[in-house]
Amino acid sequence: NGGTSGLFAFPRV
């Protein structure tokens, strides 16, 4: 999603 999710503390694309 290009940002950080609540369950994932790393940037997602």
UniProtKB/Swiss-Prot annotation:
Residue positions, PTM Valine amide: 13
Keyword entries, A-Z: Amidation, Neuropeptide, Secreted
InterPro entries: Periviscerokinin
Biological process annotations from GO: neuropeptide signaling pathway
Tissue: Dorsal ganglionic sheath of fused ventral nerve cord.
Subcellular location: Secreted
Keyword Protein biosynthesis: no
Pfam families, sorted: Periviscerokin
GO CC annotations on file: extracellular region
Protein function: Mediates visceral muscle contractile activity (myotropic activity).
Family indicated by similarity: Belongs to the periviscerokinin family.
Protein name, as recorded: Periviscerokinin-1
Source organism of the structure: Sarcophaga bullata (Grey flesh fly)
Lineage start: Eukaryota, Metazoa, Ecdysozoa, Arthropoda, Hexapoda
